[in-house]
Regions:
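Bacterial N-terminal signal peptides that target proteins for export
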Residues: 2-8
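Bacterial N-terminal signal peptides
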Residues: 10-19
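Carbohydrate-active catalytic/glycan-binding domains of CAZyme proteins
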Residues: 22-477
């Protein structure tokens, strides 16, 4: 998070390491990102000055890249007052520094207002098709199923936008909720909308390419749900991507309470319409499996490194594929005051068997690169995103020793490195398949908690639990 400590001056950190074992004694450089601008936490001086919000008051962010830069459209929220309705818009040239653009719409479109009585617009998504931008938005009130997903169109990403009315409506007695749209084109060129929140779960419906609205009547097909009795049906914020390398569709959703224990889950499928299964082969529609919190591979929940305040309730994500790089975009709340929501952008990496994993640190311009093994030994903070933990997962100490052994609060074991980016941690006291082996990727990062460049790692253990780590100090001898 934004540290209370002083952030280091802007600089490019280069470590010149004598790469032991490399022929010719050549040196290897690890390039760390420059210091990003820190946004002060809980800064009441900017409450009524949107131009100074930067990443403040960002909720349910949907991202799109255009020729003019990166744009994020997000839910109308504001700490300390009522937000102006109309879908908030921000812009960036680098995914790090964000500028306020304004509201996409002049207010709540009349049809949406009449149907729902909404006071703000939620969870937008923007796509570009055949020279036209299409903005999908949600109108509802908290806890209601009297909801509507609408659409507006424009020739320009910054508008003006022309409202096209309802895409899908639900009534208070319908079994599902028409909010949280995400529009995705499959690998065959067909367009779909995935949507839904709590109540009847997540549905997918095919859209007419020419209109951007459903091709047929009805609500579409159910692709994710949770048990109403034990979990209140708490699943929302769906987002689907297709990874050409693995020939898989990936469904991201958020579980639980957006103010308390929000967390991001993922499952995948050969088909855009499912079934979507998690790391352990459980279908996302399996509401009978117990415990329900083990359905869906948990990529990220609340977390806390060391003595830092940490973050709670990260969720409602979108995903950006930019060239060969993937990024996850989501909001999170500071632990000290959950009323404030902040925009986070993180690098997304992929395991060898095709599962996404997330950087422990927010993006600051780092690039994936080979890491010299000589600098891995040292003190680390390691963190498990245990699906059983509702609140913050807290880090614990991990020491990687030069002889290939490791020690920590988790126990003892050994580590090996492939000479490039993959680090394998094997614990002596765990059963195979129960978290014994953790396969993680090492990458440079900006350590927001203390300031400065640092190595980090991210991956999954053999039970599908997400593992994060960051280096605190190195053992040089």
């Amino acid at each position: 998070m934004m540290s209370k400590r002083k952030v280091l001056p802007v600089m490019l950190l280069l470590m010149m390491i004598g790469a032991g074992g490399c022929s010719g004694g050549r040196t290897t450089e690890v390039v760390f990102p420059e210091s990003p601008d820190a946004t002060a936490m809980y800064d009441t001086t900017v409450l009524h000055n949107e131009a100074k919000w930067t990443v403040n008051n960002a909720h349910d962010p949907g991202i799109i890249k255009t020729d003019q830069g990166y744009y994020i459209f997000s839910t109308d929220v504001k700490v300390g007052g009522e937000p102006k309705p109309g879908v908030m818009v921000r812009k960036s040239d680098d995914l790090i520094h964000w500028k306020w653009v304004g509201q996409a719409l002049p207010g709540i479109p009349q049809e949406a207002l009449d149907w729902t009585g909404a006071v703000n617009l939620w969870a937008p998504d923007v796509v570009h098709y055949d020279g036209e931008y299409r903005l999908y938005y949600s109108a509802s009130t908290f806890g209601s199923r009297q909801s509507m997903i609408g659409m507006a169109v424009s020739d320009s990403i910054e508008g003006p936008w022309s409202d096209q009315g309802a895409v899908i409506k639900t009534k208070s007695d319908d079994p599902l909720n028409a909010i949280d749209p995400n529009v995705v084109t499959d690998h065959e060129g067909r367009m779909w909308m995935v949507y839904g929140s709590f109540f009847g779960g997540i549905h997918i419906i095919e859209l007419d390419l020419s209109t951007g609205k459903p091709k047929e009547e009805g609500f579409g097909k159910l692709i994710a749900a949770r048990d109403m009795a034990s979990e209140d049906g708490a699943v929302e914020g769906p987002y689907i991507i297709y990874n050409e390398k693995f020939k898989q569709y990936y469904l991201f959703v958020s579980y639980d309470s957006l103010f308390e224990d929000y967390n991001v889950r993922v499952a995948r499928s050969d088909s855009i319409t499912g079934p979507y299964v998690d790391f352990n082969g459980r279908e996302m529609t399996d509401t009978a499996f117990e415990p329900q919190f083990e359905v869906g591979t948990k990529l990220m929940g609340g977390y806390k490194f060391g003595e830092d305040e940490g973050w709670i309730a990260p969720g409602h994500n979108s995903v950006l594929k930019d060239g060969e790089n993937y990024y996850i975009v989501h909001h999170a709340r500071g632990e000290a005051d959950k009323n404030w929501s902040y925009l986070h952008v993180r690098k997304m990496l992929w395991t060898e068997n095709g599962w996404p994993v997330l950087s422990p640190e927010r993006y600051a311009g780092e690039t994936e690169q080979d890491i010299p093994e000589a600098i891995l030994a040292g003190e680390w903070e390691r963190l498990e995103h245990d699906p059983f933990v509702d609140g913050q997962n807290e880090s614990s100490k991990l020491t990687l020793l030069k002889d290939g052994s490791m020690e920590g609060s988790r126990g003892s074991g050994s580590w090996i490195f492939d000479g490039k980016r993959t680090l394998t941690l094997t614990w002596d006291d765990a059963e195979a398949g129960g978290g014994q082996v953790e396969t993680v990727q090492v990458l440079p990062a900006w350590e927001w908690e203390r300031g400065g460049g640092a190595l980090a790692f991210t991956g999954l253990n053999d039970g599908g639990i997400a593992i994060w780590g960051k280096q605190i100090s190195r053992i040089s001898k």
